[in-house]
Amino acid sequence: MNEDNSQNSEGPSRKSFFERLSQLFQGEPKDRQELVDVIRDSEVNDLIDHDTRDMLEGVMEIAEMRVRDIMIPRSQMVTIDRTHNLDALVAIMTDAQHSRYPVISEDKDHVEGILLAKDLLKYLGSNCAPFNIQEVIRPAVVVPESKRVDRLLKEFREERYHMAIVVDEFGGVSGLVTIEDILEEIVGDIEDEFDDEEQKDIRQLSKHTFSVKALTTIEDFNHTFGTKFSDEEVDTVGGLVMTAFGHLPARGEVVDIAGYNFKVTAADSRRVVALQVTVPDLEALSHVAEE
């Protein structure tokens, strides 16, 4: 009897969940929120793990996003001028460490094509053929800012290309987007072989200023600077700063928190990336430069 009662006591909640789960497969949910609820219930009931839930929600989110929401803005693009010689190209690629570069002409709004770093290999070393950039430029794919991200992902997969130039309604270049940008919306940040895992989260720039990664934990920040910022509501310095702003700040915006000046030095359409912090008193921070 007790066993039966136990099973019956679980009945309503389990029935409710399975009814919603079965609705997912037997017919379309009534709205987006209903689908989100089913996915989250699946995690609660251990049918999927947290990472899977995040990916499923990421897939849903890109269906509502436009290319302008995830593109790398024009001001942050690393481009190559068609007049550059081989030595100049190698220097740019060594510094930027990207695999693909837009090639531009004197008119910055005219992208002649895409140059792949690997296409320069045959020109390096002794007894190589004379370099002509026109021989290695590949056609550029151009997409409007308003294009849906999920449709662009489908085109990336079907056409087997990895980068597109983004243009505004007047045909001017406004940025670029890669397949990695889209995938990161689904699975989170993707680190490649060039990401510096050992780069310090906090680096001293001058006597009073420090470079701080937005993902630095508040605990580490407090330990370094002797501050007492709370980590009950946010875990990172980026979260602390965004809370103080009350919005997603752009590069160059500044806010003061408890006497500390935070300037956004890098940000994109989704997050704060890096900050410059000016501290009020360095007497107690002489150990930072040594760490």
UniProtKB/Swiss-Prot annotation:
Keywords: CBS domain, Cobalt, Magnesium, Repeat, Transport. Residues 71-131, 136-193 form the CBS domain. Coiled coil: none annotated. It comes from the Bacteria. The keyword Hydrolase does not apply. GO terms for cellular component: plasma membrane. GO terms for molecular function: flavin adenine dinucleotide binding. InterPro entries: CBS_dom (IPR000644), CBS_dom_sf (IPR046342), CorC_N (IPR054115), FAD-bd_PCMH-like_sf (IPR036318), FAD-bd_PCMH_sub2 (IPR016169), Ion_transp-like_CBS (IPR044751), Transptr-assoc_dom (IPR005170). The keyword Repeat applies. Plays a role in the transport of magnesium and cobalt ions. PANTHER family: HEMOLYSIN-RELATED, MAGNESIUM AND COBALT EFFLUX PROTEIN CORC. This is Magnesium and cobalt efflux protein CorC.
